[in-house]
């Protein structure tokens, strides 16, 4: 008999007492924090429509975001900041943020199911689930909490750092973002350890040293 984790589609036999689903959003972007969430669903209060957050419309994610927070036994949203990403690298920063999410739960889970192929070091048993956000309801719920939280933050950064299109691409290396990065230089929320940001930073620093053009205030902060 196949393990329920290996079955295709969301498997609601995995909505068990004290099983936490954990997911992240924001490993690939050039700016902003990596955001994680951990969720323990309540078997007595099912949530219809759970799925990988990337497969849902923004409006549907927003509705489920509220419903998950209302119906889950517990949930916690955590993060690793840009400075931690640059210091640790994105993989280790993601593992740290996942650990913070699990440790932040008000109820200690019996098991943590982690989206992906590796687990952070936790004080509770854990197991990775490849494509877990499409297969395990609690991981799907975690993916929704993490994505909505991060997307809202990116929308706020659009107002603070206009001209980069952050509210649209959410920090991912789209042509619009890369062009703005080359033209305007990195902001304090850009990840200096990522090659496109580092290249833009070095190019703007070189121009500043050469005295060719004035730079916008605050764009070359470390």
Curated annotation (Swiss-Prot):
Membrane-spanning segments: none
Catalyzed chemical reaction(s): Endonucleolytic cleavage to 5'-phosphomonoester
Binding site for a divalent metal cation: 23-24, 115
Pfam family, one: RNase_HII
NCBIfam families xrefs: PRK00015.1-3, PRK00015.1-4
PANTHER family on file: RIBONUCLEASE H2 SUBUNIT A, RIBONUCLEASE HII
Protein name: Ribonuclease HII
Organism field: Pseudomonas savastanoi pv. phaseolicola (strain 1448A / Race 6) (Pseudomonas syringae pv. phaseolicola (strain 1448A / Race 6))
